[in-house]
Amino acid sequence: MTEKIILPSPAKLNLFLYITNKRADGYHELQTLFQFLDFGDDISLEVNESGEIELLNAIEGVAKEQNLIYRAAKLLQNHTACSKGAKIGVTKRLPMGGGVGGGSSNAATVLVGLNHFWQTGLSLEQLAELGLSLGADVPIFVRGFAAFAEGVGEKLVACQPRESWYVVLKPNVSISTAAVFQDPNLPRNTPKRTLSRLLSEEWTNDCEKVVRDHYFEVEDLIAELLQYATFRLTGTGACIFAEFESEAEAKAVFAHKPHNIFGFIAKGQNRSPLHQMLNLTTSPQ
């Protein structure tokens, strides 16, 4: 492969998030449902024989060694003793710090894409284990299926939630995930429920009230749009989303978003667009 190939690096949503326990080691146990979207960044890969990893558009102010895209490529290269190199570019559409998985998705697309085109032969499960060192959400994107997660997020079960249309908006604020989980008012004892029960109930997010109480940008945007749709938080934010049965309904509400707010319309995907493109199931071809 010498030509450049463009791979999708999709967004994700946490369709619900419940915190069921705070462990003695400080970690929170949760129940959450991840689903991919047909919207995201693009990663370009151009494989070569140089052995060098070259970033075509580095993030200003971020050292190469701290860039998740570069780290993912080097991790796979070192783990497999691969002698090949690559030029890697990214077209960013997802907001930084939005809670829609941009950085984790980028890292996963690089791992899966380079494993495929370098022909390093790791299974998706091996890649997921490798990717965990880059971030807790990276394995979700590597495995490539919508998933119900429990524990501290490490127990994953493939899931088939409805593939709805969504309006996703990014309030003009950055939210500290650590601060949210340290907040004394955060619910930490929501009763555990079975997946089948959760799928039949209305979904909420235990982090939402804390975030809305502390970040007026989130509270005001949700309140302003309430006359059109009910928006809720994904993860710890800052992005909020509303669910619709049709693209037309989503577009109608999207038209009412404030002009200074970034947002997009997307459809839920239970199989990652990346895995659809590369025709991946349980192991790379």
Curated annotation (Swiss-Prot):
Q: Which Enzyme Commission number(s) are listed?
A: 2.7.1.148
Q: Does the keyword Chloroplast apply?
A: no
InterPro entries linked to this entry: GHMP_kinase_C_dom, GHMP_kinase_C_sf, GHMP_kinase_N_dom, IspE, Ribosomal_Su5_D2-typ_SF, Ribsml_uS5_D2-typ_fold_subgr
Which sites are catalytic? K12, D137
Q: Which domain of life is it from?
A: Bacteria
What are the UniProt keywords, alphabetically?
Answer: ATP-binding, Isoprene biosynthesis, Kinase, Nucleotide-binding, Transferase
Q: What class of enzyme is it?
A: transferase
* GO BP field: isopentenyl diphosphate biosynthetic process, methylerythritol 4-phosphate pathway; terpenoid biosynthetic process
Which cysteines in this chain are paired by disulphide bridges? none
Name the Pfam families for this protein. Answer: GHMP_kinases_C, GHMP_kinases_N
**What is the role of this chain?**
Catalyzes the phosphorylation of the position 2 hydroxy group of 4-diphosphocytidyl-2C-methyl-D-erythritol.
The identity of this protein, by name, is 4-diphosphocytidyl-2-C-methyl-D-erythritol kinase
